């Protein structure tokens, strides 16, 4: 079957992407590693000994970065619907995060010890039609925020990929009620054509009873 011009164009951009080449050189599994590295360089969100949950982890770029930064005294639980090759000292849970059974596995892995940081690079399979894609993307963001509320310790932080569009303003307003500080950034390593941004949320206020 012949490749479409669109897919061939993407492949050409991918092969020539400097971050793809750098990832291969540095031993990272994806160019996404540099988004987290850039966030880390500016904001120092990840520290040795932290307990962290990584959502939408496959192929493992963010988990690789996080595992190295938290070190042997830290703990990292990663989850994705796709398979992910193992990373030393990383607990991986494969399954659909939107299903209760998978969520229960994540909560069981976290146990009674609350976490310092939740990171999420999740995104649905994009069709290219915003009317279809945005509700799916926002649904994942809402579920990630719900989980963060359940497992973050007071003062904990949250980093999530989010797309500007319908539901964005409401989500931001909701997050501001739950965290002391919210900041939106677009890393240099994000593709210019992408609508993705990252929300950094500091200082979780704890669950209201």
Swiss-Prot record:
Kindly report, in one word, the top-level EC class recorded for this enzyme: transferase
Entry's EC annotation: 2.1.1.166
Q: Which GO terms describe its molecular function?
A: rRNA (uridine-2'-O-)-methyltransferase activity
What cellular component GO annotations does this protein have?
A: cytoplasm
The answer to keyword Transferase applying to this record is yes
Q: Which InterPro entries match?
A: RNA_methyltr_RlmE, RNA_MeTrfase_FtsJ_dom, rRNA-MeTfrase_E, SAM-dependent_MTases_sf
**Active-site residues from the entry:** 161
Q: Where in the cell is it found?
A: Cytoplasm
Residues recorded as binding S-adenosyl-L-methionine, renumbered to this chain, are 60, 62, 80, 96, 121
Catalytic activity reads: uridine(2552) in 23S rRNA + S-adenosyl-L-methionine = 2'-O-methyluridine(2552) in 23S rRNA + S-adenosyl-L-homocysteine + H(+)
> Could you tell me the keywords of this UniProt record?
Cytoplasm, Methyltransferase, rRNA processing, S-adenosyl-L-methionine, Transferase
What family does the Swiss-Prot or TrEMBL record give for this protein? Answer: Belongs to the class I-like SAM-binding methyltransferase superfamily. RNA methyltransferase RlmE family.
The UniProt function text for this chain reads: Specifically methylates the uridine in position 2552 of 23S rRNA at the 2'-O position of the ribose in the fully assembled 50S ribosomal subunit.
| Protein name (Swiss-Prot/TrEMBL) | Ribosomal RNA large subunit methyltransferase E
What is the protein's species of origin?
Pseudomonas fluorescens (strain Pf0-1)
Gene name? rlmE
């Amino acid at each position: 079957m012949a490749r479409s011009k669109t897919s061939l164009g993407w492949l050409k951009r991918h092969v020539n992407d400097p971050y793809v080449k750098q990832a291969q050189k540095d031993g990272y599994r994806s160019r996404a590693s540099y988004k987290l590295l850039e966030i880390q360089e500016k904001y120092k969100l990840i520290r040795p000994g932290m307990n962290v949950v990584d959502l939408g982890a496959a192929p493992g770029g963010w988990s690789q970065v996080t595992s190295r930064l938290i070190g042997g005294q830290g703990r990292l639980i990663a989850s994705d619907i796709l398979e992910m090759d193992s990373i030393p000292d990383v607990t991986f849970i494969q399954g659909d995060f939107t299903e209760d059974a998978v969520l229960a596995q994540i909560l069981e892995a976290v146990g009674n010890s609350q976490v310092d940081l939740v990171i999420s690079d999740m995104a649905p399979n994009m069709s290219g039609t915003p009317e279809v894609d945005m509700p799916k993307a926002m649904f994942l963001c809402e579920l990630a925020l719900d989980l963060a509320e359940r497992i973050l310790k007071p003062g904990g932080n949250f980093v999530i990929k989010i797309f500007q569009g319908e539901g964005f303003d409401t989500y931001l307003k909701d997050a501001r009620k739950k965290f002391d500080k919210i900041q939106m950034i677009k890393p240099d390593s994000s593709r210019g054509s992408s609508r993705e941004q990252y929300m950094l949320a500091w200082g979780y206020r704890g669950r209201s009873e």
